[in-house]
Amino acid sequence: MDRIRIRGGHPLAGEIAIGGAKNAALPVMACGLLTDDRLVLNNVPRLADIGTMKALIEQHGIAVERLDPLGRILSLGGQITNTEAPYDIVRKMRASVLVLGPLLARCGEARVSLPGGCAIGTRPVDMHLKGLEQMGAVITLESGYIDARVQGRLRGADIVLPMPSVGATENLLMAASLADGITTLRNAAREPEIEDLAHCLISMGAKIEGIGTGELRIEGVKHLHGAEHSIIPDRIETGSYACAAAITGGRLLLRNARLDHLGAVARTLREAGVEIEEQDSGLLVSRRNGLHGVDVMTEPYPGFPTDMQAQYMVLMSVAEGASMVTETIFENRFMHVPELNRMGARINVHGASAIVRGVSQLSGAPVMATDLRASLSLILAGLAAEGETIVNRVYHLDRGYESVAEKLSACGADIERISG
């Protein structure tokens, strides 16, 4: 099993190209199920989750081709021949449930395995199902599968989400694009990835109003056509490498990064002492003086994203003073804390909050990655630590970060990925 070795203490300097956003690419790939025509996607990241979605789309009969040597341009096209999304694929990635809405809207039926670890009623997947039921779908749960059917077309509906779930907004937005009548999604998620999906759907012929707001109005059409669409830059990758520049006292140009997508991340980092300068080619991130503790609470966009919580906590672990990090989106998302404490951090968890008392220096240690964002947080800690850090179980990284060791090494980090 691969691991990453880091010898810390080297300020980063150079440029890192920010890739396409995984969380935008996955739902946009699902749009390939909404038309027989060809959908061409540019700036697609090369990640394990993209490969999983590719396999799932192909399972339904849609051909997915890579049009360039690096695989960043995908072509999707063909007729749906199968409406079942099997457990063997869906278990690998929660976002696999995004095929439910398109399959149901297009074919009138879908059988999709419940995503791994999903408990109906306590996880956001129930919002997908209730919204589709309001649009006329009949849904049953049996043997770990969602069975959904509708007579004729889905019908437009006025849907109020109990919370601004990103996945539910995406699924219902795609389904409503082919529904009969007008659908209003209230308390919809507002993330840039939702905007990107809406723009792709509009380029395919969908009629959507309210993009970027909490209320989306979708006038369903009978058919969508092919299009070409470019995936937006990954704001979480941007924030992660901004933390890398700050924690090492370095200076990085993050090419293609967009300040308008960072929202609360940029504001919070600046308040903590990180300098972020917008340039034509991206964002220049540096730190000239010390960091100081700033409290943060994760919230739906435009609030501070839960996917940046672990990385920010590492930054606070070497900041002057104390800070409180409160997680409101997901339960049990502090699994990186014991590993950071092994490296000398002083973090105490109290329910949904973690109290972080900054230390002057972290120490290298063998640590275990527990999930995607925790993996990157441990790498950040290793970059700042004195001595050698070994991060185990780094396969999590491949789901959301492309060539991390290579990108950081090119900017002066002493880091390598070790196989076996």
Swiss-Prot record:
Binding, phosphoenolpyruvate: K22, N23
Sequence positions bearing 2-(S-cysteinyl)pyruvic acid O-phosphothioketal: C118
Pfam family, one: EPSP_synthase
Binding site for UDP-N-acetyl-alpha-D-glucosamine: R94, D307, I329
Entry keyword annotation includes Transferase: yes
Major location (coarse): cytoplasm
GO terms under biological process: cell division; cell wall organization; peptidoglycan biosynthetic process; regulation of cell shape; UDP-N-acetylgalactosamine biosynthetic process
Pathway: Cell wall biogenesis; peptidoglycan biosynthesis
Keyword Cytoplasm assigned: yes
A GO term, aspect molecular function: UDP-N-acetylglucosamine 1-carboxyvinyltransferase activity
SUPFAM superfamilies, A to Z: EPT/RTPC-like
Active site residues according to the UniProt entry: C118
Reactions catalysed according to its record: phosphoenolpyruvate + UDP-N-acetyl-alpha-D-glucosamine = UDP-N-acetyl-3-O-(1-carboxyvinyl)-alpha-D-glucosamine + phosphate
Disulphide bridges, residue numbers: none
Enzyme Commission code(s) on record: 2.5.1.7
Compartments (UniProt record): Cytoplasm
GO CC term, one of those recorded: cytoplasm
Domain of life (superkingdom): Bacteria
Keywords annotated in UniProt: Cell cycle, Cell division, Cell shape, Cell wall biogenesis/degradation, Cytoplasm, Peptidoglycan synthesis, Pyruvate, Transferase
Function: Cell wall formation. Adds enolpyruvyl to UDP-N-acetylglucosamine.
Family, per entry: Belongs to the EPSP synthase family. MurA subfamily.
The name this protein goes by in its record: UDP-N-acetylglucosamine 1-carboxyvinyltransferase
Encoding gene (name): murA
